[in-house]
Amino acid sequence: MVEQKDYVSYSVLINGIEVNAVYSRDSIDGIFRPLLRRLTRMQREKNRRVLVLFAAPPGAGKSTLLSFLERLAEEDEHSGEVQVIGMDGFHRRQAYLVSRTVIRDGEEIPMTRIKGAPETFDLEKLTERLQMVAAGERCGWPVYDRRLHDPVDNVITVDGDIVLLEGNYLLLDEPGWRDLRGFADYTVLIRADEDMLRRRLTDRKAGAWRPVRKRKSSWISAT
């Protein structure tokens, strides 16, 4: 993390790809620090684990942002300890996707062609594990291995007091998915320009990533 007068540059490996992000001082001091301190107060008042859901489309920079928040909390004496986890570990296994089909626009196609869509996640398993996290249990958490193209279970041990969970569909208003917010103490929805998202996803597939500059306008809704 390199600090300048008006911004902070931050580099981190996300799924094996080096990401270079730039966050303005206005965003850090006006949004990020106040959010972390609010969550800290909430955790202390409730005297239990606090679970926060961060939802955003692919390419919005949510993994990088939460990594930055985790780092920021470590350096802020007024913030509690933060632990970041993601929902990618709940992808269905490749063998499952290969053996099943789905109807799209009247055509039956293999589920592998829509990998990453809501129905290609194990929602039941995610719900069960989220229930454990929300209850304050110390539990294992899976991650997605992009080399294996499969999830690996219990790579992370969830034991933090303030847990930030990021994912594409955590606030999706569809059966089953909409129940997830009931486990959360706080939710954040991040929106971003569609053209920017397309550029980033193209770069991601090429093994590159454009520097990210988060602005206040990216934060649309928090409850």
Pin down the residues of each PLM region.
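Post-Walker A helix-loop "phosphate-sensing" segment adjacent to the P-loop in P-loop NTPases
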Residues: R71-Q83
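Conserved nucleotide-sensing/catalytic segment adjacent to the nucleotide-binding pocket
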Residues: Q83-G86, F90-R146
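Conserved lysine of the Walker
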Residues: K62
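Charged, amphipathic alpha-helical linker segments immediately N-terminal to NTP-binding catalytic cores
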Residues: M1-I31
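ATP-dependent NMP and nucleoside kinases share a basic, alpha-helical "lid"
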Residues: L148-R204
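Walker A (P-loop) phosphate-binding loop of P-loop NTPases
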Residues: G59
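Hydrophobic positions on the alpha1 helix immediately C-terminal to the Walker A/P-loop
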Residues: L65
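Pre-Walker A adenine-sensing motif
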Residues: R33-E45
